[in-house]
Amino acid sequence: MTGLFITLEGPEGAGKSTNREYLAERLRAAGIEVLLTREPGGTPLAERIRDVLLTPVEEVMNADTELLLVFAARAQHLATVIRPALERGAVVLCDRFTDSTYAYQGAGRGLSLARIAALEDFVQGELRPDLTLVFDLPVDVGLARASARGRLDRFEQEGQAFFQKVREAFLARAAAAPQRYVLVDAAQPLAQVQQSLDSLLPQLLERARG
């Protein structure tokens, strides 16, 4: 039996974590096994790599170093958490995955998309998400929400120009493959966002039940 791999993507402050929990509740209420996880992270080792990636330090991290750390964490995450869950038929809801790598390290840092694609193939093989929800909102709104949460991490400290590139990359990827991506207006009040998610539930349940 093969599970269902759903990723939640979007810039800072888009509400991915909150809505991931909401989707999980709705799916579990229908009797579906759901695994909640996140990137970078998802395993003890990958969470340690996450800390390195997100914690601001005096030494400037080279962009290639950042990219390789992201994929190192992903390799561990896939091997020990995501693939086993999918193999037993679970629905995996992952807060960020490789689309974020294309957006942040590709568009934001200006790294080669071909290099990212090569690492994607090496680490993931043929595994790609079955569905990706892109939570979109204006950059200034997202950064204001992130700031309201408290201390900013290393990525959240980037400026508006960086996050505009990130947003545009997410939108471009969603437009290029509408069969896999669903765009969600995350600038709406939370109740309206969750109404949008409710409208997706019938097809998610059908796919999860095979």
Curated annotation (Swiss-Prot):
A GO term from the CC aspect: cytosol
Binding, ATP: G10, P11, E12, G13, A14, G15, K16, S17
Enzyme Commission number: 2.7.4.9
InterPro entries linked: P-loop_NTPase, Thymidylate_kin-like_dom, Thymidylate_kin_CS, Thymidylate_kinase
Gene3D superfamilies registered for this protein in UniProt: P-loop containing nucleotide triphosphate hydrolases
Pfam family, one: Thymidylate_kin
Keywords for the protein's UniProt record, in alphabetical order: ATP-binding, Kinase, Nucleotide biosynthesis, Nucleotide-binding, Transferase
Transmembrane portions of the chain: none
Keyword Zinc-finger tagged: no
GO biological process assignments: dTDP biosynthetic process; dTTP biosynthetic process; dUDP biosynthetic process
Catalyzed reactions: dTMP + ATP = dTDP + ADP
Molecular function via GO: ATP binding; dTMP kinase activity
Domain of life from the UniProt record: Bacteria
Function field: Phosphorylation of dTMP to form dTDP in both de novo and salvage pathways of dTTP synthesis.
Stated family: Belongs to the thymidylate kinase family.
Name of the protein in question: Thymidylate kinase
